[in-house]
Amino acid sequence: MEFEVKKTFGKARLGVMKLHHGAVETPVFMPVGTNANVKLLTPRDLEEAGAEIILSNTFHLMLKPGVEIIKLHRGLHNFMGWKRPILTDSGGFQVFSLPKIRIDDEGVVFRSPIDGSKVFLNPEISMEVQIALGSDICMVFDHCPVPDADYEEVKEATERTYRWALRSKKAFKTENQALFGIVQGGIYPDLRRESALQLTSIGFDGYAIGGLSIGEERSLTLEMTEVTVEFLPEDKPRYFMGGGSPELILELVDRGVDMFDSVFPTRIARHGTALTWNGKLNLKASYNKRSLEPVDERCGCYTCKNFTRSYIHHLFDRGEVLGQILLTIHNINFMISLMKEVRRSIESGTFKELKSKVVEVYSSGGVNV
């Protein structure tokens, strides 16, 4: 892959990644399609929203449908009908989020969330699966510590992440895919620095900031991001794993981060909350019952062009899945539009003004929450 920083505004960067399935402008938000689909959306919905790259999950696809089924389709792109770039997570986040039977230097034995059977995953298996999936960007297999881990536990996870990164790179034998390293270190600046230096000494196509936005205070999220970015190379993309709220993304862009993913926009849509340029909007609330306004007057998505707040409120009131679909369409369109505005503002030198507005309306809870 190739990455070029075209312009900067402070630490905020306007760039472009050239990947096997196309170019991706940064800063970029990646909708999450864990099981080879973004919940409730078709690939055409994503294309119409302007999504340039999506994320899928190695661990879950390894379980169902299984690598052999995806190989029958000659890769994940054909399997899910998506022609643009894909990033696959390595399964490392599941070290933190799923029940584990055993974790040591060799790898992790999980309890399958599907049938309770034992599943073994290590750097070599993760690389083998991601190569078979054919994703444009693959992630090293890492050890993401739990939020309440003490210093020694985080240190052990950080050292293991380094050893697993070495093994991941050694096992990554492919030409058309990129491999990103993942920096760990929890909320400890010295471990963040150590991890960043270790990963950059190996050399990867890009670097992710992992193990944050998992329950720690926002101030710590931002502080640890600053510490990490300081030791990452200028000529490689930087990816904050799991950051998806508008105000957090703007804060992170201001600190030099280029890539983001989260289930946040789609998850809150399924629960009746829309993201707008004035903050969050609760479509379940009774004050929308008679509203003839669109979800967001500034939005040109299918939902906002064709339906009123009143209608979407009615759909949620009656438990109709169409309400969830329409808000998911809108929220993904909003996030893609937000990132376009971020890129324009870096280009035009107005990023600070955009950031101030977005942080203000979302940090205050927005309107009609």
UniProtKB/Swiss-Prot annotation:
Catalytic reaction equation(s): 7-aminomethyl-7-carbaguanine + guanosine(34) in tRNA = 7-aminomethyl-7-carbaguanosine(34) in tRNA + guanine
Return the Gene3D superfamilies for the record. Answer: Queuine tRNA-ribosyltransferase-like
- Co-factor remark: Binds 1 zinc ion per subunit.
Recorded GO terms, molecular function? metal ion binding; tRNA-guanosine(34) queuine transglycosylase activity
Keyword check for Ubl conjugation: no
Q: A Pfam family matched by this chain, by name?
A: TGT
| Cofactor(s) required, per the database record | Zn(2+)
Q: In which family does this protein belong, per the annotation?
A: Belongs to the queuine tRNA-ribosyltransferase family.
Q: How does it assemble?
A: Homodimer. Within each dimer, one monomer is responsible for RNA recognition and catalysis, while the other monomer binds to the replacement base PreQ1.
Its biological purpose? Catalyzes the base-exchange of a guanine (G) residue with the queuine precursor 7-aminomethyl-7-deazaguanine (PreQ1) at position 34 (anticodon wobble position) in tRNAs with GU(N) anticodons (tRNA-Asp, -Asn, -His and -Tyr). Catalysis occurs through a double-displacement mechanism. The nucleophile active site attacks the C1' of nucleotide 34 to detach the guanine base from the RNA, forming a covalent enzyme-RNA intermediate. The proton acceptor active site deprotonates the incoming PreQ1, allowing a nucleophilic attack on the C1' of the ribose to form the product.
Q: What is this protein called?
A: Queuine tRNA-ribosyltransferase
- Organism of provenance: Thermotoga sp. (strain RQ2)
Q: What lineage is this protein's organism placed in?
A: Bacteria, Thermotogati, Thermotogota, Thermotogae, Thermotogales
